């Protein structure tokens, strides 16, 4: 199985571990970063749709992009999913498995393996640059990433565990992905007092990270083994959903 997980906007500035691999699209990321570094703070704030404070932080990051110390991607992000993935406490065996089976989706680097070296940055799907042929960045990546993802899954067992988000599906020709490989997308719901099921963003992100950790620690081989996942009251509900969308309910 191959696993897909989204990156996070919040990033650590340092990591204790050194990366062991280079991003597949490092040269593309370099070109994008160089163009971002040519903008002033106001232009960055507009492109990234963020505050002046965040724009200033990332203006500095892009100016230091080529010389900043790299850290492994899986240890660089600090969003909700990554807080529950707790990558810093994974064993060497789990990290070795992750390096072969986990892809991290990313608007700047495209696709990352967990131990690829990256530097702190911020990038949004709507950014358009000369380097992207003036296309929004998610459209720019589509032709580059679709075959990479499909080929990596086919070279494994033909199954993709989709724990990324809908926003990052636009990095790929997602219709083609679903036609050529088997996509399993776990869904996480909280049962309301009236019995209705509701997806809550914070819980969904937390569970995605925790499920990645579960897969890595147990080195799962089949999607059926996901049924053993339980976390913070979420349990597999076999009576709900279908095989492609296993439901986990709290």
Regions found by a protein language model. Name each.
Residues 4-89:
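Active-site helix-to-loop segments that bind/position phosphate- or nucleotide-bearing substrates
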Residues 87-242, 247-250:
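Internal, well-folded beta-alpha domain core
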Residues 2-6, 159-162:
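Short hydrophobic beta-strand segments
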